[in-house]
């Protein structure tokens, strides 16, 4: 039995000495690759994505050789950085909208009266998520404006064409999350007022 324990201990020590195939996540592009959307998005999925995307915002850019687009000169690199940051902010606001939607109560039904406090707390959580989304929308607008500057307008980055389309749609007003978020905040206000008027029974 003692020989078995010694052998097991030696194997554990040898295994610990072997190099692992892990790598450090350091750059924006690496964090962005960890972002993913599920067919059915649960709150913990949104929170995980928010974590990766917020780290992407804080992280430095990788060398242009490892960019998600083909970068051949400094002006392309500048536009790429603006588009990337805009896109990350859009994804962050979408994740906050998904998360807020899980806590949002669309209607104040009379039979929810006994759960009035829980529903009000849920509405508060949804409002917090929507207000965070509004912050990221403002950030996305700022970065889209930079990406759409006159001197960058004709710089084409085919591998991230979707990001360029987002910036163009923001400029033209066809992509307007601000309107969506304000509408949701208005709904929350109305539903909250109805819950607050309810008695604690039906």
Name each model-derived stretch.
Residues 109-125:
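Acidic, serine/threonine/proline-rich low-complexity intrinsically disordered regions
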Residues 15-17:
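N-terminal signal peptide c-region/cleavage motif recognized by signal peptidases
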Residues 2-10:
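Sec-dependent signal peptide recognition
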Residues 59-67, 136, 143, 150:
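Residue position in alpha-helical solenoids
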Residues 25-48, 79-112, 152-184, 188:
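Amphipathic alpha-helical repeat scaffolds of TPR domains
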Residues 20-84, 193-202:
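Immediate post-signal-peptide N-terminus of mature secreted/exported proteins
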